[in-house]
Structures are given as structure tokens and as C-alpha cells.
Amino acid sequence: DSGSAVVALTNDRDTSYFGEIGIGTPPQKFTVIFDTGSSVLWVPSSKAHSMYESSGSSTYKEQDFIEATDETDNVFLHRLFDGILGLSFQTISVPVWYNMLNQGLVKRFSFWLNRNVDEEEGGELVFGGLDPNHFRGDHTYVPVTYQYYWQFGIGDVLIGDKSTGFCAPGCQAFADSGTSLLSGPTAIVTQINHAIGANSEELNVFGLTPEQYILKGEATQCISGFTAMDATLLGPLWILGDVFMRPYHTVFDYGNLLVGFAEAA
């Protein structure tokens, strides 16, 4: 679309997708995950990553935020990205992208996530439109049911061609670009993992100390992309993370409060 801005994304082993932003004037560069499951902007200061220097920006006071100057944990130490930029609603906290919205620059944005980790182009985030090169056919749009996450209702969950009937009373889901896996209620995820042959019933259990299992290495096994999560506050809830968003080009339309899905190309 004319007037749109494209952010190239890097695919980190199908576990996260991140791109570059600039903060301040002149812009200081950071790599962040663009997260539709949160609203805050995190730019941690770490020796292993870029560090935001507030005195180096002439527009330091234009956006309200909290700056942490000391952190005991090392959450981002071994990550390839510097932080997280939230793209959800202001019900959580006022997100940075609302500045673009209030200036009339952006009414929607869209994601394409490449599953092929060997390709140079890891993905694409388009602010203000969508890229026709990365989807086929028309998008199917569903209304946002609650402006906290990009949340919408789903009518059923099928395993193969058979209905589970679990969502007959109604289920909620939200598309979350900051979550690697697809999370859902334990009762259904257990059935899904059993259907695809993922189980631990025949495995022995061996205990390990933190010193033994905290190490850096390549994975040698296949891991199910479905993870169980029972949400008590919102009822049956599905988090459609990158596992879902890779095969489906996803549009987040704030102007019409819709989420759209089309086959990714």
C-alpha cells in the first residue's frame, strides 16, 4: 500500500522473529521482537546488546516510559535481539505504536513469517498495509471481541476432520507474534500431541541439577509445537503463536477492529 512502512524480520530458528527500530533523535538502533501479545516497549541495557543512552536523544521526553538502570537477571543475555516492542491495545499500557495511530499514519499492520530458516528473508512486518506478494486469495476477517489482546472467538477445534466439541460453549483466541508455540487447553492439546505421536509415556525420568542442564548446544530432537495452558480468567483460551502465524498471513486492523488470515505465500 502507498504510505506503508516495511520492516524486514530475521527468523531465529523458528523461535522468534525480530527487526530493527530507531529510538530518539538521532535514532539509536535496536533489534526487537514485534509482539502483538503485549503493549510495552522493552529495551534492556546489557553488555551483550545495544544500550539506550537517554542523553544522546533530543526527544527523550516525548514518550512516557520507565528506564531500568540495573537488572539482576539475564533474560536477553543470550538472545539475538535487544528487546520487545508491544503491538497490542492500550488496555494493558499505552503502546508506542499508538503514536503512529494518533497521527493518522497507521490504521492496520500485517505479518508474514517465513518458516524456511535457510532463506535470507526471515519475514516482514508492514505498518499501514499488507504485501500482496506474501499471501494468496482473500483474507478471512473476524471481529476483535476484547481490546486487551488481538482476541477473537472460535467455534470449534478439529483434530483431523473430527470435531473435539470442546469449544461448543465458546472459546477465545488471540494471534500472538511474540509466542513461539501454539498454546491451548490441556484437554485438547493432549489429544493433539497424542494424534501426532508426541508423548512421554515410554520415557524414563532422570534428574539433573541446574549446573548440568544449563548449557549451549544444538537441539537433536523434534519438539511438539503445541503446549498446554489452562486460562482461568478468560475461560478456554488459545494463543496462536508463530506456529499458527507462519502458514497464515495475518492482518491486524485497528481501524475496523478486525483480525484477518490468508494463506501465506
From Swiss-Prot:
N-glycosylated. The active site is at D35, D176. Inhibited by pepstatin. GO terms for cellular component: endoplasmic reticulum; extracellular region; membrane; protein storage vacuole. Its main location: membrane. Optimum pH is 4.3. Active from pH 3 to pH 7.0. It is found in: Microsome membrane; Protein storage vacuole; Secreted, Cell wall; Secreted, Extracellular space, Extracellular matrix. It holds the Pfam family Asp. Pistils. Its EC number is 3.4.23.-. Disulfide bonds join C167-C171. Belongs to the peptidase A1 family. Aspartic protease with a high preference for bonds between hydrophobic residues. This is Cardosin-H. It comes from Cynara cardunculus.
